[in-house]
Amino acid sequence: MRLLDGGSFTAESSREVVQANCVHWRKKFSFMCKMSASASTGILDPCIYRVSVRKELKGGKAYAKLGFADLNLAEFAGSGNTTRRCLLEGYDTKNTRQDNSILKVLISMQLMSGDPCFKTPPSTSMSIPIAGESESLEEDRKGGETLKVHLGIADLSAKSASVPDELGAWGHSRTSSYASQQSKVSGYSTCHSRSSSFSEFCHRRNTSVGSTSTGIESILEPCDETEPITAEPSPDPTAAAATATTTTAKEEEASEKLARCPVKQDSVESQLKRVDDTRVDADDIVEKILQSQDFSLDSSAEEEGLRLFVGPGGSTTFGSHHLPNRVGSGAYEQVVIKR
């Protein structure tokens, strides 16, 4: 493993034996890396991390390079635990046949310091749906909180047993010609996806690690158990009526308990509800303003407005009813228009 940008980190995993065309390393690597962002766009610059796979020869005295996979850690910033499957690229594609192997990597990133506001570069990965595939290559990502890189080891073969995401692992599998035809060909998933693989860079937010909601459901929690309702026959009519009344009262009490029983909402629905509660409803504000206004017709307001006055020679002027008193009596006469 080698960090090409944003720092200097090199590491080697332990040597493992190939079993059933698969290799499981189950190793975890942690290191710090520095990412810069464009001042104009805020998009993170590429931060390449290379994982190369080698095969020992001559009893460990020599080795052959099977291939490598370059991971742009900037694509995973802020995505929490992300799993990526990569097809190994060959070093010498002209003279050497490329190895048919898939590397599975789990990436977890944590923001240690710096500005938490940034944009991830567009993903260069591809998502290939497979019919009958039980494990989705494009699952909801998990949020995290910090910027440290953890590297682990996972299984990359279609036939081998699956490794849980918590056991971050690097894996590399070699498939035969028949197995390669039957293998689960998986491309790169998006930077927001979470497959099962090996290193992880997270800029964790509020989402809890491991919470993957698939829908909104309301689950009714168990309420307090109600007492069994029994009505024993009684020869006395008064006692029978009392028993029936008690039974009805218990039924009403049980229904009230069920009504008061709290309903546990899914995390997504509860988060949306909390966000809506903090927002001001514009319709309510407009309704309050309309209710506070008086739109009734006031006749007295019309009489106190401007009036038309006509003076000698046909001159006109506008003013209130105090205008004749100011300009002198007889100078202007009020014009009255009857409706």
UniProtKB/Swiss-Prot annotation:
Ranges for domain C2 NT-type: 1-111
Modified residues (Phosphoserine): 197, 255, 267, 299-300, 329
One Pfam family of this chain: NT-C2
Keywords (A to Z) from UniProt: Phosphoprotein
Amino acid composition bias (Low complexity), ranges on this chain: 230-248
Stretches with biased composition (Basic and acidic residues): 249-259
Keyword ATP-binding part of the UniProt annotation: no
Region described as Disordered: 226-262
Tissues with expression: Expressed in bone marrow-derived macrophages.
Family: Belongs to the EEIG family.
Entry protein name: EEIG family member 2
Organism per entry: Mus musculus (Mouse)
This protein's encoding gene: Eeig2
